[in-house]
């Protein structure tokens, strides 16, 4: 088995799959949920396994490890929030990933009873409509009940590191 990039390895191991999929740049999200509108009941985690599913109805999906407390918390509350982080929120991401303790940087806003991170580019308050087991993860499909967004630069994750975006070409949205 080889660790060299660019060589074909016939064995698909979790490590090699993680390295391969790490080459797909993604935004960084914090998934949150709470039993009530009290900051002491908030549970959150950093996640990049998030995607849109449908525009009509408005559905998104987050993939959570079955070993994570968040999987149980989402099942218990039936709701979750997605905060898509801004470029200056790396410390917040690290806080929720357990890599750093930065409680002074964590401020919540509440939308539809769901905690979301102040300063994020996007807030999505979701109600779980389906949960599907998928290997060692659960795919939680959520209906977006309320959303908010702002302009700015996103925090990006690529090959295990935080990055920023560089504009290539035109500075206009593609039909949005």
From Swiss-Prot:
Optimum pH is 7.5. It catalyses: a reduced flavin + NAD(+) = an oxidized flavin + NADH + 2 H(+). Induction: By 4-NP in the presence of NphR. Keywords: FAD, Flavoprotein, NAD, Oxidoreductase. NAD(+) binds at residues 52, 137, 157-160. Pfam families: Flavin_Reduct. Its EC number is 1.5.1.36. One of its GO terms (molecular function) is riboflavin reductase (NADPH) activity. It is an enzyme of class 1 (oxidoreductase). The keyword rRNA processing does not apply. FAD binds at residues 39-46, 48-49, 63-65, 69-70, 95-96. One of its GO terms (biological process) is 4-nitrophenol catabolic process. It comes from the Bacteria. Belongs to the non-flavoprotein flavin reductase family. Homodimer. 4-nitrophenol 2-monooxygenase complex consists of an oxygenase component NphA1 and a flavin reductase component NphA2. Catalyzes the reduction of FAD with the concomitant oxidation of NADH. NAD is the physiological electron donor. Subsequently, the reduced flavins diffuse to the oxygenase component NphA2. This is NADH-dependent flavin reductase. The gene is nphA2.
């Amino acid at each position: 088995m080889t660790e060299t990039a660019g060589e074909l390895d016939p064995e698909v191991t979790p490590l090699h799959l993680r390295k391969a999929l790490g080459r797909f740049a993604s935004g960084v999200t914090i998934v949150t949920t709470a039993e009530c509108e009290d900051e002491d009941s908030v549970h959150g985690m950093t996640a990049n396994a998030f995607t849109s599913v449908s525009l009509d109805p408005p559905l998104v999906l987050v993939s959570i490890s079955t070993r994570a407390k968040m999987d149980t918390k989402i099942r218990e509350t039936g709701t979750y929030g997605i905060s898509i982080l801004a470029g200056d929120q790396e410390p917040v991401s690290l806080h929720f990933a357990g890599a750093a303790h930065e409680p002074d940087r964590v401020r919540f806003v509440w939308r539809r009873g769901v905690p979301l991170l102040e300063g994020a580019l996007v807030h999505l308050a979701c109600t779980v409509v389906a949960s599907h087991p998928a290997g060692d993860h659960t795919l939680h499909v959520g209906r977006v009940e309320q959303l908010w967004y702002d302009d700015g630069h996103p925090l990006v994750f690529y090959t295990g590191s935080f990055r920023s975006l560089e504009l290539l070409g035109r500075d206009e949205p593609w039909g949005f």
